[in-house]
Amino acid sequence: RSRLFVKAVDGSRVEREEMVWQRALAEFRKGSPLCESPIERDLLAGLLTADWGYFHTENAVIHDCRNEEFPDEPVVIAPQLVVARYRLDFALVLRRGKITRTVAIECDGKDYHDRERDNRRDEYLSALGIGTIRHVGQDIHRIPLGCANEIAEGVAFWWEQFPQ
């Protein structure tokens, strides 16, 4: 926990960081039971503490697809969201201004993924306007926040490729 506060130098920043951390922890407690594997839980922790500044928010929030209305937040993480015939490890629903886009986040553990099947799935989702980002389970387990920050940077870059 103390590593999250390394950049904090003045009292107000420490307090703000503490609030951000508390919100991320509450969201993790809400989202963790929805995850189906340890690497998904690891990545969830990273996604909840990643740098989402491009989307003008400090925290992502969890959406439980089973029993909640969709929150009106800039970055929403929906674990196990069903899209047509697929269930995504995570759907990132991103809002900036009046524009909303969805990105599938897949945690590729060596036992459960087949490249050919994954490519078909990615093409299907792409036809629906949903991009896919994949991370290898070993990397997620080793550096979950690093993977999550790569995802945050990747979706910011991806977002810029669309006409506004």
Q: How should each PLM-predicted stretch be described?
A:
Residues 1-75, 164:
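Solvent-exposed, charged helical/coil patches
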Residues 2-3, 73-78, 103-110:
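Short, mixed-charge, low-aromatic patches
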Residues 8, 24-26, 45, 50, ...:
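A sequence-composition feature that detects small, non-aromatic residues
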Residues 22, 80, 138, 161-164:
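Residue-identity detector for glutamine
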Residues 30, 34, 77-78, 112, ...:
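A general structural-boundary detector
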Residues 36-40, 83, 144-147:
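Phosphate/oxyanion-binding active-site loops and adjacent basic polyanion-contact surfaces
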Residues 58-101:
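Active-site metal-binding core of divalent-cation-utilizing nuclease and nuclease-like domains
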Residues 86-157, 161:
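Basic, amphipathic alpha-helical patches used to engage nucleic acids or provide basic targeting signals
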